[in-house]
Amino acid sequence: MSPSFLVLLTILGPGNSLQLQDPWGHETKEAPGPVHLRERRQVVGDDDFEDPDYTYNTDPPELLKNVTNTVAAHPELPTTVVMLERDSTSAGTSERATEKIATTDPTAPGTGGTAVGMLSTDSATQWSLTSVETVQPASTEVETSQPAPMEAETSQPAPMEAETSQPAPMEAETSQPAPMEADTSQPAPMEAETSQPAPNEAETSKPAPTEAETSKPAPTEAETTQLPRIQAVKTLFTTSAATEVPSTEPTTMETASTESNESTIFLGPSVTHLPDSGLKKGLIVTPGNSPAPTLPGSSDLIPVKQCLLIILILASLATIFLVCTVVLAVRLSRKTHMYPVRNYSPTEMICISSLLPEGGDGAPVTANGGLPKVQDLKTEPSGDRDGDDLTLHSFLP
């Protein structure tokens, strides 16, 4: 047992140490059966992808699955475990590590074997550089002190982290204990949600880095043969991702769209889940807010207008009815209080005049009840005037 491996056991605890001792102590014995293409990728490379090979899809007898499960649950562990385990292998020569992997690798069907092999070749020499620093409890601090090769190492145990939104130097500067925390440190909530599942998928199913390499065959082939090119390409990827992250952080929906689109270049199908979730969330928010309130608002306004019109019509009818009743009542009251007026026809006057005495036919009774004056013979010619006066007096009150 090397001292670095003992330090690994003390850091991870008894449960994790037991799981790690068996697979690393007997690498050749525990991998006799067929292994996934991810392990074939590791055979092409060095010990770098032995840690990512322990995905949920590996065979049940292998104990490496348990190690990967713990790593997926706790993102801090995968970096430390990979570094220490690789340190134990890096204590020997890089060639020795490659030989052990070759013995463990049987041919098995898988995807993206060439890309994984490229990364694994780079990791063997790089882990030998980091063997001294991995003893430190904080894996992120070790990454800060290490040069460009360390960037390649950090991207391999957690490929989604380095390639998606935050490069290895960004994680070192933030000095965050877990890569998941580095993703969640972004102010935009949608970014945290989208970036968090990305590292989980990358750790559980390690074909993500291989797909990234397959999408760009020229730099990946260079990686298989030359280590500095790997570092340069990865630094470019991480710097571009780092520059894209702050620009997309202020807007939540834009970050989800831009990060997912740009990360697909590196991650491939693993990122396809992210834009779907982001778009679904956006769709759930926007249709609920825009059409829903407008429809009920318009439906509410229409009945109100109709009710107002009906009320106005009824009010106008009521006023007309009241006015008509008042007018009719006034007219009826006037008719009842009218007094009859006597109308004297000319025929009646004629009858009265005919009844008056003419000349000396006795002493007629005047209308006032007085006797007419006795007229002398001299006054006979004025008899007509007296008769006229009597007729006039008869009409006077």
Swiss-Prot record:
Residues 1-17 form the signal peptide. The modification Phosphothreonine is found at residue 391. Residues 89-261, 364-390 are annotated as: Disordered. Residues 18-41 form a propeptide. One of its GO terms (cellular component) is plasma membrane. Changing residue 261 to A: No effect on P-selectin binding. InterPro entries: PSGL-1. Displays complex, core-2, sialylated and fucosylated O-linked oligosaccharides, at least some of which appear to contain poly-N-acetyllactosamine with varying degrees of substitution. Mainly disialylated or neutral forms of the core-2 tetrasaccharide, Galbeta1-->4GlcNAcbeta1-->6(Galbeta1-->3)GalNAcOH. The GlcN:GalN ratio is approximately 2:1 and the Man:Fuc ratio 3:5. Contains about 14% fucose with alpha-1,3 linkage present in two forms: One species is a disialylated, monofucosylated glycan, and the other, a monosialylated, trifucosylated glycan with a polylactosamine backbone. Its main location: membrane. The modification Sulfotyrosine is found at residue 54. GO terms for biological process: leukocyte adhesive activation; leukocyte tethering or rolling. The chain crosses the membrane at residues 308-328. Keywords: Cell adhesion, Cell membrane, Cleavage on pair of basic residues, Disulfide bond, Glycoprotein, Membrane, Phosphoprotein, Repeat, Sialic acid, Signal, Sulfation, Transmembrane, Transmembrane helix. Glycans are attached at residues 58, 66, 261. The modification Phosphoserine is found at residue 394. Highly expressed in blood, bone marrow, brain, adipose tissue, spleen, and thymus. Also expressed in heart, kidney, liver, muscle, ovary, and stomach. Sequence repeats lie at residues 126-135, 136-145, 146-155, 156-165, 166-175, 176-185, 186-195, 196-205, 206-215, 216-225. A SLe(x)-type proteoglycan, which through high affinity, calcium-dependent interactions with E- and P-selectins, mediates rapid rolling of leukocytes over vascular surfaces during the initial steps in inflammation. Critical for the initial leukocyte capture. PANTHER family: P-SELECTIN GLYCOPROTEIN LIGAND 1 (PTHR17384:SF7), P-SELECTIN GLYCOPROTEIN LIGAND-1 (PTHR17384). Homodimer; disulfide-linked. Interacts with P- and E-selectins, through their lectin/EGF domains. Interaction with P-selectin requires sialyl Lewis X glycan modification and tyrosine sulfation, probably on Tyr-54, for high affinity binding. Dimerization appears not to be required for P-selectin/SELP binding. Interacts with SNX20. Interacts with MSN and SYK; mediates SYK activation downstream of SELPLG. Interacts with HAVCR1. This is P-selectin glycoprotein ligand 1. It comes from Mus musculus. The gene is Selplg.
